[in-house]
């Protein structure tokens, strides 16, 4: 095998400087605005499938474009450019029926990139390198594409190996310098790619070139899509010998830092990092500027984290050039010496390190058809669900590796092994640990290796069939990246005595390390634990032989480990489990002291050595060390005595109703059982000796119970729905006590003239949804959780004026005020409340929460208006931490110091330049000076252009408005998107169980999610059957024409203009020929002729009746039910909007009559046309709702607008319908002053937004403040 000189060349450069890899190819291709014919060219002009979007084809059909993009990146400073082959496998190309072109795609892509590198290299005198990009494909080995069949896979390991091998071979033939296996979301796929590449180098004689490997961490959980941590990913793929490893895609640089840092500490290779240009915005675009991204990556470089940096989605040559400049002169990271030298690394979803500090690794033994009759029967009967429970019990009992054996004559071993391993891969609590694939059939071992993404242990190979077969199998195991168990077995048979055991192990070790190239730390010797106490004298020393052989192996074979099947030692005592378990414990005690560091053992059934009865311990040690020839007989007698005595059954049952009243109340609170709480509370109250006052019942047994609830919730052992149910129990108990407490208070006042103002609470919180906003689900949850944690909550409801909030805070002597809001105008109202709190002299902390709020807005806009604590609370649990910290005088100062430093850091990063005075700050950000805006006139010149001569508007089936009253909810159920429902309850699944219904499989929240979902189904049926809610809607279609940035709508009968929807145009700097979008771009212009295009309008609600119904529930202290009803109403409203849009497309407007989309497709927006809402990214101005309401007469359907233009009922949706097939969602983003204020350009009037609407500039700025990109007074 020949090795390229590039290894040394790149290593030398990496010692001198940080290298640069290019940015996004797809982003740059999109900017070329290519059409179908560009992708087809001549070669595919008659192809049977649409090809637009198959970017890899452009290397064949438009190589000029690809060359241009490569050259732009190289001229920007890139050392490496990636070939245009992200989807260049037969598997990915199958979607386009282009499998036959895979060689040409990869070969030509490599040639184009090679030419660009050579040209720029010649011009600059600096050599540039081509990375052959190998993407992940659109299939995964670790995750089933079918929810119903978790063991199903739509691709095999060998199919991926073949596809990756073909791609890599063609890339190398085209002249790439490096192979880059990138965007790895499933380590099993990466292992297939690396397997294919190593096969090319080691078996086909292809000269070896460097390999880079880059994974993708999908979110802040720090895991890949298939669930592995970054460190586990490194362990799983180390056999591919990459010279650089790192991360790309999914995250922006700032969020990627901690994961890159972890990799940097773990890996002795180069580290590469090419993140996205920030996180996607609401419409999937990327907003991070080149300067912002470069500054973050500069910090990576200064901290010694990286050797190669670049960009992924949303990055451009400008980003790469900024990075190139940012790291000039900064020394590259120096890779550390192997941080895990002398240790064995394994992985499941998480890494596992086996070294001296681990002492002993338990290998769970019960998933073995040869060793467990129950497990065998489960597998034979295809009862895999219960079989997985066996695995789960092993892990819960302490197994650190899971042994899986499917060797039974009546089983299809490869099938059973693959199916079981695939099933447990979707069980995070099991899959977190490595697997030991245990079989005497090498085909079963291969099946297992190809069904798991982690680094496994293979159990086993041996010299039984000679050295050649041994080496062949060892090389295969090594290429799959597994560690290996080697049996003390050779051509002469199984070793029993110490010397023979060591002789075979030493010979095997030499072959593996010297001839096969195995890492010594990945070698595990099974020195044969054989059965003692068989009655045969020659077996009596088997225990001692193993222990002595273990000592010799560990002393003479560096790095090697020793393992064995512990239960073999006690096989003579089958049926006497107590004796066997004790024998295993004694054997392990001595074997571990000799150096045995792993063992197949039932981890949950080992007694502690020192807990074994001394007479029994003496007998077992005599037997193990063959010190008493009568030991076997004596042990049998002892076993019979133990059997005669038997074991007392544990008859403990769940009889909580027979416990003390205090324990009953605590149990009811934790479990959320309200059936007996009033009676139990009354029983406690009547015990006046123990609880002289009703308040004492709250302070002691009830608060003791809620303290347990709070602890469990804080530790993540209880979930929000359970907490709310606990609160329901607490509220009922307190409601029962309140009349007695009031009576007591009144009696004290009358008898002694006292004004008792005692409180059992930590503090009082006044909480409200601010004026103009009607959304309260999140606020209600916060109120409940605070109440559960011993805070008195005064809930002022929704649409609460500032003066009412302040008045309530003063009257209630509140310790905190909490403000909530969902819509953007609520942010300004929160600022107003903060100002007023300061004006009237309040000094209590202000808590800010709600979907539209953020820490940045709180720190920059709200906190400076109020010189006392202002805290942004991300969710309900955060509010508890904040209130508790601020209530505890021992931690309050430290908490506030941290908070102030954090907010000051936020303000500094936002480039806040000066304070106006002690309480107020200037809202001028230096960063806004650097923001690149395009003049309004120029943006209009670069509008999104549609060839209107080729577009014939479809006339709707009716013109004017049509109402849909009392709509049948049953028709909406299939359109419900359940993910936001679980978000309401703060139930968020993790890899790969984020979405519905996969969330039910999540190890942490799945059970609770299923319970809440089942409750929702019950409530949904109740709401529908009892006609609690009403769903109304109104839809209107009107003739329309665009004029500049605005859309006029017309009376269908007279042709007179009815009104105008005013539009905002994107104004942030854009590169090359990117369009600046405005909604008016999607409507035929007026200047073309009479209006013959159309605009749709709609408003719908599913919340009529919800507020009244929930009020009754809340009066009955059932917050859980109230939140449930509101959450369901919200989901039904969104479902109604989705249903209406489909009806519009297919029937009412009928511009997409042949649409064949599933509910999933609808939720993924795979249809023609859009329905943007006023106040959202494509038109951020909420005031446009006034025009919409006037034209729709929406009030007739029971939907009204509040003062701040929120919709009431809150469970309502509204917007516009656009039918143009080229219409698309976009975000207006920040706008400059020339789009807001009236100006003149060269005597030509450029009409601005305020002038067109005939509204004062200040009012426009107030409504558009979130997108204003200049300094406001």
From Swiss-Prot:
Any GO CC annotation of this UniProt entry: cytosol
Similarity annotation: Belongs to the vitamin-B12 dependent methionine synthase family.
Family matches, as InterPro entries: Cbl-bd_cap, Cobalamin-bd, Cobalamin-bd_sf, Dihydropteroate_synth-like_sf, HCY_dom, HCY_dom_sf, Met_Synthase/Corrinoid, Met_synthase_B12-bd
Keywords assigned by UniProt, alphabetized: Amino-acid biosynthesis, Cobalamin, Cobalt, Metal-binding, Methionine biosynthesis, Methyltransferase, Repeat, S-adenosyl-L-methionine, Transferase, Zinc
Function, in words: Catalyzes the transfer of a methyl group from methyl-cobalamin to homocysteine, yielding enzyme-bound cob(I)alamin and methionine. Subsequently, remethylates the cofactor using methyltetrahydrofolate.
Cofactor needs: methylcob(III)alamin; Zn(2+)
Domain AdoMet activation span(s) in chain numbering: 927-1273
Residue ranges occupied by any B12-binding N-terminal domain in the UniProt entry: 652-749
Record-linked PROSITE patterns: ADOMET_ACTIVATION, B12_BINDING, B12_BINDING_NTER, HCY, PTERIN_BINDING
Domain comment as written in the entry: Modular enzyme with four functionally distinct domains. The isolated Hcy-binding domain catalyzes methyl transfer from free methylcobalamin to homocysteine. The Hcy-binding domain in association with the pterin-binding domain catalyzes the methylation of cob(I)alamin by methyltetrahydrofolate and the methylation of homocysteine. The B12-binding domain binds the cofactor. The AdoMet activation domain binds S-adenosyl-L-methionine. Under aerobic conditions cob(I)alamin can be converted to inactive cob(II)alamin.
Binding of methylcob(III)alamin, residues: 699, 772-776, 820, 824, 876
One example GO MF annotation: zinc ion binding
Superkingdom, natural source: Eukaryota
Catalytic activity: (6S)-5-methyl-5,6,7,8-tetrahydrofolate + L-homocysteine = (6S)-5,6,7,8-tetrahydrofolate + L-methionine
Extra remark beyond the main annotation: L-homocysteine is bound via the zinc atom.
Keyword Metal-binding: yes
UniProt domain B12-binding: residue ranges: 762-897
Functional pathway: Amino-acid biosynthesis; L-methionine biosynthesis via de novo pathway; L-methionine from L-homocysteine (MetH route): step 1/1
Binding site for Zn(2+): 249, 312-313
Organism annotation: Caenorhabditis briggsae
Cofactor stoichiometry and binding remark: Binds 1 zinc ion per subunit.
SMART domains: B12-binding_2
Protein name: Probable methionine synthase
Record's keyword annotation contains Metal-binding: yes
GO biological process: homocysteine metabolic process; methionine biosynthetic process; methylation; tetrahydrofolate metabolic process
Residues of the Pterin-binding domain: 360-621
Residues the record lists as binding S-adenosyl-L-methionine: 977, 1171, 1225-1226
């Amino acid at each position: 095998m020949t090795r390229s000189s590039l290894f040394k060349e790149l290593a030398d450069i990496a010692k001198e400087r940080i290298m640069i890899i290019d940015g996004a190819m797809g982003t740059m291709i999109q900017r070329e605005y290519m059409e179908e014919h560009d992708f087809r060219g001549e070669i595919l002009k008659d192809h049977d499938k649409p090809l637009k979007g198959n970017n890899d084809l452009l290397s064949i059909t438009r190589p000029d474009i690809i060359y241009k993009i490569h050259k732009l990146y190289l001229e920007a400073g890139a050392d490496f450019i990636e070939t245009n082959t992200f989807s260049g496998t037969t598997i990915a190309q199958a979607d386009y029926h282009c499998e036959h072109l895979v060689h040409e795609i990869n070969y030509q892509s490599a040639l184009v990139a090679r030419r660009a590198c050579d040209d720029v290299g010649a011009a600059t005198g600096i050599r540039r390198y081509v990375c052959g990009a190998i993407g992940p494909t659109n299939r995964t080995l670790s995750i089933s594409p079918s929810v119903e069949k978790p063991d199903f896979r739509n691709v095999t390991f060998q199919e991926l190996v073949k596809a990756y091998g073909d791609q890599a071979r063609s890339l190398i033939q085209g002249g790439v310098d490096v192979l880059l296996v990138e965007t790895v979301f499933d380590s099993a796929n990466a292992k297939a790619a690396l397997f294919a590449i190593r096969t090319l180098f080691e078996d086909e004689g292809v000269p070896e070139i460097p390999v880079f490997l880059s994974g993708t961490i999908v979110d802040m959980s720090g895991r890949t899509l298939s669930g592995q941590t970054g460190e586990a990913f490194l362990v799983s793929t180390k056999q591919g010998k990459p010279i650089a490893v790192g991360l790309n895609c999914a995250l922006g640089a700032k969020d990627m830092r901690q994961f890159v840092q972890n990799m940097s500490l773990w890996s002795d290779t180069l580290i590469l990092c090419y993140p996205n240009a920030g996180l996607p915005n609401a419409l999937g675009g990327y907003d991070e500027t080149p300067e912002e991204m470069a500054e973050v990556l500069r910090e990576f470089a200064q901290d010694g984290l990286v050797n190669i940096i670049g960009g992924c989605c949303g990055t451009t040559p400008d980003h790469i050039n900024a990075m190139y400049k940012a790291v000039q002169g900064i020394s590259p990271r120096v890779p550390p010496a192997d941080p895990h030298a002398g240790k064995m690394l394994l992985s499941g979803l998480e890494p596992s390190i086996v070294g001296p500090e681990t002492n002993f690794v338990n290998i769970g033994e019960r998933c073995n058809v040869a060793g467990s009759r129950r497990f065998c029967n489960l597998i034979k009967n295809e009862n895999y669900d219960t079989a997985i429970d066996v695995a789960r019990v092993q892990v819960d009992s302490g197994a650190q590796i899971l042994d899986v054996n499917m060797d039974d004559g009546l089983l299809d071993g490869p099938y059973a092994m693959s199916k079981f391993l695939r099933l447990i891969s979707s069980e995070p609590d099991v899959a977190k640990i490595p697997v030991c694939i245990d079989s005497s059939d090498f085909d079963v071992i291969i099946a297992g290796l190809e069904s798991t993404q982690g680094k496994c242990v293979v159990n086993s190979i041996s010299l039984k069939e000679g050295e050649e077969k041994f080496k062949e199998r060892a090389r295969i195991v090594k290429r799959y990246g597994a560690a290996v168990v080697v049996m003390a077995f050779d051509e002469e048979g199984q070793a029993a005595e110490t010397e023979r055991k060591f002789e075979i192990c030493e010979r095997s070790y030499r072959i593996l390390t010297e001839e096969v190239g195995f890492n010594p730390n990945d070698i595990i010797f099974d020195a044969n634990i054989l059965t003692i106490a068989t009655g045969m004298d020659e077996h009596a020393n088997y225990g001692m032989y193993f222990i002595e052989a273990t000592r010799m192996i560990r002393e003479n074979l560096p790095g090697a480990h020793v393992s064995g099947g512990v239960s073999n030692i006690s096989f003579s005592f089958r049926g006497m489990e107590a004796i066997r378990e004790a024998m295993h414990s004694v054997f392990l005690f001595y074997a571990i002291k000799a150096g045995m560091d792993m063992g197949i053992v039932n981890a949950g059934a080992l007694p502690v050595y020192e807990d074994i009865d001394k007479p029994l311990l003496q007998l077992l040690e005599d037997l193990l060390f063959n010190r008493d020839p009568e030991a076997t007989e004596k042990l049998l007698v002892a076993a019979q005595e133990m059997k005669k005595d038997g074991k007392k059954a544990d008859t403990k049952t769940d009889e909580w109703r027979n416990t003390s009243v205090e324990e009953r109340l605590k149990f009811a609170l934790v479990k959320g059982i309200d059936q007996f709480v009033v009676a139990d509370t009354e029983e406690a109250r009547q015990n006046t000796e123990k609880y002289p006052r009703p308040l004492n019942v709250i302070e002691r047994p009830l608060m003791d119970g809620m303290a347990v609830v709070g602890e469990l919730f804080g530790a993540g052992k209880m979930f929000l729905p359970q907490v709310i149910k606990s609160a329901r129990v607490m509220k009922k108990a307190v409601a029962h006590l309140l009349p007695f407490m009031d009576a007591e208070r009144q009696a004290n006042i009358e008898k002694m003239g006292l004004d008792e103002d005692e409180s059992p609470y930590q503090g009082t919180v006044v909480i409200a949804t601010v004026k103009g906003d009607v959304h309260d689900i999140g606020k209600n949850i916060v109120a409940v959780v605070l109440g559960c944690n011993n805070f008195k909550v005064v809930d002022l409801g929704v649409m609460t004026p500032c003066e009412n909030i302040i008045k309530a805070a003063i009257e209630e002597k509140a310790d905190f005020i909490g403000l909530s809001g969902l819509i953007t105008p609520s942010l300004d109202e929160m600022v107003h409340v903060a100002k007023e709190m300061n004006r009237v002299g309040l000094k209590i902390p202000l808590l800010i929460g709600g979907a539209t709020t953020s820490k940045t807005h709180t720190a920059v806009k709200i906190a400076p208006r109020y010189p006392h604590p202002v805290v942004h609370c991300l969710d309900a649990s955060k509010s508890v931490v904040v209130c508790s910290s601020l209530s505890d005088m021992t931690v309050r100062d430290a908490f506030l110091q941290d908070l102030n430093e954090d907010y000051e850091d936020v303000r500094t990063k936002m480039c806040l330049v000066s304070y106006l005075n002690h309480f107020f700050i200037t809202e001028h950000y230096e960063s806004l000076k650097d923001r690149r805006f395009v003049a309004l006139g120029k943006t209009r010149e670069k509008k999104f252009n549609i060839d209107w001569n080729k577009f014939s508007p479809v006339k709707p089936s009716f013109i004017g408005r049509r109402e849909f009253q009392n709509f049948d909810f049953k028709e909406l159920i299939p359109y419900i998107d359940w993910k936001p429902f679980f978000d309401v309850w703060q139930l968020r699944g993790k890899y790969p169980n984020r979405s519905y219904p996969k969330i039910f499989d999540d190890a942490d929240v799945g059970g609770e999610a299923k319970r809440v979902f089942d409750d929702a189904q019950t409530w949904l049926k109740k709401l529908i059957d009892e006609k609690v809610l009403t769903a109304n809607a109104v839809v209107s279609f009107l003739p329309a024409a665009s004029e500049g940035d605005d859309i006029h709508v017309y009376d269908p009968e007279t042709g007179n203009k009815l009104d105008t929807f005013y539009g905002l145009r994107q104004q942030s700097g854009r590169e090359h020929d990117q369009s600046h979008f405005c909604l008016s771009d999607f409507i035929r212009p007026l200047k073309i002729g009479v209006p013959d295009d159309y605009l749709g309008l709609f408003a719908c609600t599913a919340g009529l009746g919800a507020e009244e119904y929930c009020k009754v529930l809340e009066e009955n202290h059932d917050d859980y039910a109230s939140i449930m009803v509101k959450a369901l109403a919200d989901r039904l409203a969104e479902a109604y909007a989705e249903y209406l849009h489909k009806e519009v497309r297919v029937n009412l407007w009928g511009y997409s009559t042949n649409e064949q989309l599933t509910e999933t497709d609808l939720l993924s927006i795979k249809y023609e046309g859009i329905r943007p809402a006023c106040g959202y990214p494509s038109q951020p101005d909420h005031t446009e709702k006034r025009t919409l309401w006037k034209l729709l007469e929406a009030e007739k359907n029971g939907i009204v607008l509040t003062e701040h233009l929120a919709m009431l009922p809150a469970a309502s949706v509204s917007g516009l319908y656009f039918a143009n097939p080229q219409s698309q969602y976009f975000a207006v983003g920040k706008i400059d002053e020339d789009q807001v204020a009236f100006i003149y350009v060269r005597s030509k009037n450029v009409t601005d937004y305020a002038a067109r609407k005939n509204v004062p500039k200040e009012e426009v700025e107030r409504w558009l403040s979130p997108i204003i990109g200049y300094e406001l007074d």
